[in-house]
């Protein structure tokens, strides 16, 4: 594993407290509000003309939950993140044509959301561990691109 035992403990301890639906919806909504041009990937999700549309779009909330649940799978596979995300990397590259830079952006937003939802537990050490995790997830999702 690229993570120390201490980093793994920090990640697992915080992740056990995460509300995936709330944090996932928040993270994806933030991505689409901060970077509105990213909405083009989700045009089939319906109305997203305004930030309020994004915040109240059930499909965005559901997909955010799905995305964060997938991120949570990385937590369960800290020793093989790349192998675990091989299929998703291929899918996002071949079918969805998602710019792999989005994986880094969303990873950073997930970290912000986790910090907001868990301010007490989100110490600098925990932040560093999750930053490392987000980097590994983004790299794993980008494998097919290079």
UniProtKB/Swiss-Prot annotation:
Keywords: Heme, Iron, Metal-binding, Oxygen transport, Transport
GO annotation terms (biological process): hydrogen peroxide catabolic process
Top-level taxon in the UniProt lineage: Eukaryota
GO CC entries: blood microparticle; haptoglobin-hemoglobin complex; hemoglobin complex
Molecular-function annotations in GO: haptoglobin binding; heme binding; metal ion binding; organic acid binding; oxygen binding; oxygen carrier activity; peroxidase activity
One Pfam assignment: Globin
UniProt keyword Iron present: yes
Keyword presence, Zinc: no
Entry binding sites for heme b: 63, 92
Tissue expression per record: Red blood cells.
Domain Globin residues, every copy: 2-146
Subunit structure, interactors included: Heterotetramer of two alpha chains and two beta chains. When oxygenated in vitro, exists virtually only in polymeric form. When deoxygenated, forms tetramers, octamers and larger polymers.
Main function: Involved in oxygen transport from the lung to the various peripheral tissues.
Family: Belongs to the globin family.
More about this protein: Displays a pronounced Bohr effect despite the lack of the His at position 146 conserved in the beta subunit in most other vertebrates. Shows chloride-dependent sensitivity to organophosphates like ATP and 2,3-diphosphoglycerate (DPG) but not to inositol hexaphosphate (IHP). Binds molecular CO(2), not bicarbonate as reported for other crocodilians.
Protein name: Hemoglobin subunit beta
Source organism of the structure: Paleosuchus palpebrosus (Cuvier's smooth-fronted caiman)
